[in-house]
């Protein structure tokens, strides 16, 4: 049994913006609720169900795959809420894996870079091209089947536990 958590919302808002206006705390809270608390909520509920499974190979009962982002490591200007929540997802990966190990449940996280999604497809080239240029190789957006292949690898490799894997073509986001 596998649970793949893919929650993600963001906001483009600086800590202190124009006219020295502070970041809207309601917006920050909404991003935390969805990206971080929502991810933990689904993980804890899925783990409770998985704990009832009959153990399979290696006595495994399940796998939870959470989705972070390269923003967890390379948050850009205006991404404080998003980067904080995705950093939180990375930060809870190992403790969740340790908590669930006695139950035979693994937990890993994928930190994708810039992927070819409907949201990114709607972005103008002037937004997409600089992001593609920051990618080392291959110089393109990631494709959803590549994310799915990483999930499949995590399913098949039962020795992989408590890890966050960047799936990003080597991108290192610049501050802007």
Regions found by a protein language model. Give the residues of each.
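Short, small/polar-rich loop/turn modules that mediate ligand/substrate recognition or access, typified
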Residues: 101, 106, 161-163
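C-terminal substrate-recognition "lid" of short-chain dehydrogenase/reductases
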Residues: 143-167, 172
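Active-site helix of classical SDR
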Residues: 43, 85, 93
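Catalytic Tyr-x(3-8)-Lys segment
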Residues: 31-33, 126-146
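Residue(s) in the substrate-gating loop at a strand-loop-helix junction
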Residues: 69
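Catalytic Tyr-X3-Lys loop
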Residues: 1, 9, 21-41, 65, ...
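Conserved mid-core segment of classical short-chain dehydrogenase/reductases
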Residues: 10-29, 48, 52-58, 78-81, ...
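Alpha-helical segment proximal to the catalytic Tyr-Lys
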Residues: 48, 98-99
């Amino acid at each position: 049994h596998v649970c793949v958590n893919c929650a993600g919302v963001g906001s483009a808002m600086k800590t202190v913006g124009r006219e020295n206006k502070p970041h809207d705390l309601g917006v920050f809270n909404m991003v935390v609720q969805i990206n971080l608390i929502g991810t933990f909520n689904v993980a804890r509920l899925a783990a409770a169900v998985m704990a009832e499974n009959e153990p399979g190979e290696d006595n495994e009962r399940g796998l939870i795959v959470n989705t972070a982002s390269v923003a967890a490591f390379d948050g850009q200007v205006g991404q404080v809420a998003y980067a904080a929540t995705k950093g939180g997802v990375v930060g809870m990966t190992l403790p969740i894996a340790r908590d669930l190990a006695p139950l035979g449940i693994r937990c890993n996280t994928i930190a994708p870079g810039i992927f070819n999604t409907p949201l990114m497809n709607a972005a103008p080239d002037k937004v997409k091209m600089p992001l593609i240029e920051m990618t080392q190789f291959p110089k393109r957006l990631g494709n959803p089947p590549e994310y799915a292949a990483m999930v499949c690898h995590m399913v098949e490799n039962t020795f992989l536990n408590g890890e966050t894997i960047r799936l990003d073509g080597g991108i290192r986001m610049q501050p802007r």
